[in-house]
Amino acid sequence: MKKYQKKFIELSLKAKALKFGDFTLKSGRQSPYFFNAASLIEYGELSILADCLKAKVKEDGLKFDMIFGPAYKGIFLATLLANKMSEKKRMPVCFNRKEIKDHGLSLIHI
């Protein structure tokens, strides 16, 4: 197991983001585990999470010029990763909304 993988699992368990048991997923499927990304926000060790994400991107040799974070929980993950990736090169973030606002610019993608 790689160092970043171990750190991610340890963080997930400490933050109680990774749970084991009998869960019904949004899709209706049964699962022996559940991952609640919001628990990572509440735990407050987001820099560790961002380091793990950056290590995985580097390991896989991924190249991109923007990071997309799907609403809502994906927005904070994309922002964290972009912040870490921006240490060497500017990395913009975009995200969507689940609903179009009827005020401002009325955009579904930001």
Q: Residues of each region from the PLM?
A:
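PRPP-associated nucleotide enzymes
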Residues: 1-109
